[in-house]
């Protein structure tokens, strides 16, 4: 919320501001806007690929970028899913997502067609007695690419942890820290970052 950023800068000008992934920063105009507003670290949207991250890092060399590298991928645009608010009255855009896309559902029979293609099923779900997480996207794991991100100028890596145990967070943080240290020592094992 630009208003919150403005108030924070007005009342606490010495506090560094970090922008959440929920701001969905996906392009140079957004980065320029938030930078001009006084944001020091911008967490880029999870949906960006290496080419987009590289372009932003090259266009804005003084910006401290953070990239989400490990955890759940959102069914919608990151942080903008309404399913959690609808199912559990816990809005994702307030950091309270219950990840209902990961719940197991049973679609007894569902055919979806688009108005202009009547009679042509675009999406079909048919299941028996079992339940499944058919809405859940595959988790994000960019461990192999942390060196590439570091070389692009990404200054911080974001790991999912809000809904995880302390032990899980410690283990994942250690794995990524080790990968970054190996990259800093230029040990072999990383992919071609193209």
Where are these regions (language model features)?
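As written
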Residues: 38-39
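Active-site pocket-lining/capping segments in soluble small-molecule metabolic enzymes
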Residues: 2-25, 43-44, 52-156, 163-194
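Conserved nucleotide-cofactor-binding alpha/beta core module
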Residues: 28-29
């Amino acid at each position: 919320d630009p208003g919150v950023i403005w108030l924070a800068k007005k009342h606490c000008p010495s506090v560094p501001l970090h922008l959440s992934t929920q701001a969905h920063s996906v392009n140079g105009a957004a980065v320029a806007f938030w930078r001009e507003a006084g944001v020091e670290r911008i967490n880029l949207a999870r949906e960006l690929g290496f080419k987009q991250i590289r372009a932003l890092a090259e266009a804005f060399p003084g910006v401290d970028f953070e990239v989400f590298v490990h955890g759940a991928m959102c069914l919608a645009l990151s942080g903008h899913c309404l399913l959690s608010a609808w199912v559990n009255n816990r809005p994702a855009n307030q950091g309270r997502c219950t990840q209902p896309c990961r719940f197991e559902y049973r679609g007894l029979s569902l055919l979806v067609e688009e108005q202009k293609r009547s009679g042509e099923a675009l999406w079909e779900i048919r299941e028996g007695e079992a339940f499944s997480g058919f809405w859940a996207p595959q988790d994000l794991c960019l461990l192999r690419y942390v060196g590439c991100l570091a070389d692009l100028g990404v200054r911080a890596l974001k790991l999912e942890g809000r809904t995880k145990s302390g032990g899980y967070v410690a283990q994942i943080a250690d794995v990524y820290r080790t990968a970054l240290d190996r990259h800093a020592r230029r040990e072999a094992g990383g992919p071609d970052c193209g």
